[in-house]
Every structure is written in structure tokens, then in C-alpha cells.
């Protein structure tokens, strides 16, 4: 299940472009009532195609958003830990390569994460990397630090600092930080090198089928610029590990 359905994609784009539903409707040749009905869950591929150019979205992708699901992840080295968060979920990602284990983010409360790690026979990962300081990503961090796990992040209490462009070598893996601010400020993505394919942990900057919400139009444009800057050089087969929802690939997005 995607983190955002088509109504959230619409609302995030409208907010990011400082457009009202009426303004978007007028520019797209639609009625305001059609756009409002779409925003409330009445999907229409035709309306999606009409709105997409106004919202700077891919028309074919937006028209298909109601059916879109990325291909399932089939890598034994990467495990999605699906953790509860309010009425939804949040991800932690466990990455194993030979004797090296990494954890990306830690959920909102420690108990479900610690239980999952114990069940996976990995109570103490070799290192933790935190994408950003929102509460649903750092809740398990203090307990894991107390277990002796080194943690890395940017402006996150208890972590060793890592800045965009810097890297850390953990066992067989190299983790390189990049700037994915916009939804959160600061916010890091983590390139993970040494696996069988390129991997980028995106936090809440990018989900399958959408991006993280931004507080202002300026931050929305900033977020898009940082995503383009980070993603453009990467090969299409790059695996993307988001903070919510399923893993995806650069080619899929």
C-alpha cells in the first residue's frame, strides 16, 4: 500500500504551488467542483491527466496512480521493518551484508522495533543512520544507543554528526550522506554502497508515488530541487527505501 493516495498527491502539489482548487481547475479547463470531488476521493484518470501539467506532474503516472504499486522487494540483504505510527505505519530498514548490519531510522516507540530486531536475531545493529529528527523516526534511538549501537545523524541528539557529502565505512559497506531537506530541515538521504545494487534510503523526502509534504511553497521547490540533484546521477535500477510505504526503484518513480 502506498503512503499517499492520489488525493494526497493533489493536495501536496496544490500547497506546494500555492494554487487553490479553483485556480487549478481554471487553468486545466475543469470546473472547481470536479477538482474538489477528485480531492475528496472520486478518482478520474481524465481529470488526473488534465491537472497533471498544471501541477508539474507526469500525466501518465498521475492518471495511473490509483493502480500504481512498485515491484516487490526481493533482496535477502534488506528487510523492511513495518512499525505502527498513529493510524498508519513508519519504516525502519535493516540491511545485512555478510557480518555487517545497518539500521535506517527507529520508529516512534522503542518496543515494536526492539521486538522486531530481536525476532530477526539482530538486537544490536553495527550502526544506526537517522534520516531526520521527526518523532516517528527517532523513537527507538535512545534504547539502541543504550545497547551500545553507534548512531549517525545531522542535528539529532545522541548521534555522531554526519553531513551531506560525508561518508562512513561500516564493515563491508560505505554509507554516504546527501541533502534531502525540504520535508524536514535538515534531512539526509543515505547512499549505501557495497550491496549487489545501488541503494538510497530517502527518509520522508520521497515515497513510492509521491514525496513528503512541505510546509511552504518555497520548501516544496527546495525539496524538488534536492531530489533532482540527488537522483539524476543515479542509475535507474537504484533501490529507494522510503520512510513510509513500500520500497521502490528510481526507474519506477
PLM regions with names:
Residues 69-118, 190-203, 209:
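Conserved beta-strand hairpin/beta-sheet module of binuclear metal-dependent hydrolase folds
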Residues 109, 120, 184-253:
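Metallo-beta-lactamase
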Residues 46-61:
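DNA major-groove recognition helix of helix-turn-helix/homeodomain DNA-binding modules
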Residues 59-73:
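Short amphipathic recognition helices of helix-turn-helix/homeodomain-type DNA-binding modules
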Residues 17-35:
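Short alpha-helical DNA-recognition segment
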Residues 1-17:
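A short, Lys/Arg-rich alpha-helix, primarily the initiator
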Residues 93-96, 165-195:
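Core dinuclear metal-dependent hydrolase active-site scaffold
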Residues 109-176:
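Active-site HxH/HxHxD metal-binding segment of metal-dependent hydrolases
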